[in-house]
Every structure is written in C-alpha cells, then in structure tokens.
Amino acid sequence: MRSLLLTVLLNLVVLLATTGAVSSNLNTAVNYASTSKIRFLSTEYNADEKRSLRGDYNNEVTKEPNTSDEERAFSISKSAEYVKMVLYGFKLGFSPRTQSKTVLRYEDKLFTALYKSGETPRSLRTKHLDKASASVFFNRFKKWYDKNVGPS
C-alpha cells in the first residue's frame, strides 16, 4: 500500500514539475499563457535544434563525424552478405562457367575478402592442390588479382 501511495505521489510530482506547465486557473492565466514563451530546463536540451546521436552540436569544437572510419556492428545484412558469399563460393566450385551480374558481384566481394585476409593465388593453390574443381576457381582468382592488385 505504501509503494502504491509513493507511486501516485511520484507521478503527481512529475506531472506538476513539467517545464512550461500552465496553471489550471484559466481566468488569471490567459494573459500569462499567451504572452510568455515556454522555458526549457537548459539550453542544451532545446526542442528546436536538430538532435544528433554522434556529437554535440552546441559545442563549436566538435567537428562533423566521419562515419566511414568506424567499424559497424555485426548486423543481419552483413551476415546475409557473408552467407551469400560463401554460397557463391560453393556455386563457383560446382559450376565455374556462370557469368551473370550477381555472380560477378559476389565473386568480386569474395575475392576482395580473400585478398584482405592475406591470401594470394600462390598461397591458395598450395593450400588446395587436391581439389578437382579448384583450378577454375584459382584461375579466376588469379585474373582478378592481376587486374585489381597487380601481377603476382
């Protein structure tokens, strides 16, 4: 019972302490409500300004955030792209003569990921010499590597 009373009192205090609240006496408050502006608690929390989650625009020292230099969290779209790249790798191993635009796009992403992980055509060939369909994959990776990175 005591917690219910405290909850009701807390809600009452919060409602009455709202900034810019006008009293319920309309006869005397009409002039006040029509001539005065709403006062905010602080100029930092002004409702007229744009809100930003990346920085404080009230501070003149703050520069525009550079969103390209930060690493994004692991998301569903990233994981879906990763699964598509892996599936494309399997598809390329089984049917190496596919040349559609989506296949070439995922091939480029797959080869870029391989290059960023430090793989070269020689290192891949030495790791996977025993696979029968590996030669087509390595030839395509070598062509991509020579075109984008330089001769190996």
UniProtKB/Swiss-Prot annotation:
Its predominant location is: secreted
Question: Where is this gene product found?
Answer: Secreted; Host nucleus, Host nucleolus; Host nucleus; Host cell membrane
Locus of motif RxLR-dEER: 51-72
- As annotated in the record, motif RGD RLK-binding motif runs over 54-56
Endpoints of the signal sequence = 1-24
Q: What induces it?
A: Expression is induced during host plant infection.
Region (W motif) residue ranges read 99-152
Q: Which domain of life is it from?
A: Eukaryota
- Sorted alphabetically, which keywords does the UniProt record give? Glycoprotein, Host cell membrane, Host membrane, Host nucleus, Membrane, Secreted, Signal, Virulence
List glycan-bearing residues. Answer: 66
Can you cite an annotated GO cellular component? extracellular region
Annotated domain remarks: The RxLR-dEER motif acts to carry the protein into the host cell cytoplasm through binding to cell surface phosphatidylinositol-3-phosphate.
Q: Which family does it belong to?
A: Belongs to the RxLR effector family.
Tell me the subunit arrangement. Interacts with host defense protein RGA2/Rpi-blb1. Interacts with host legume-type lectin receptor kinase LECRK19.
Its function? Answer: Secreted effector that acts as an elicitor of hypersensitive response (HR) specifically on plants carrying defense protein RGA2/Rpi-blb1. Enhances P.infestans colonization of plant hosts Nicotiana benthamiana and potato Solanum bulbocastanum leaves. Associates with host legume-type lectin receptor kinases and disrupts attachments between the host plasma membrane and cell wall.
The molecule here is called: RxLR effector protein Avrblb1
**What is the originating organism of this protein?**
Phytophthora infestans (strain T30-4)
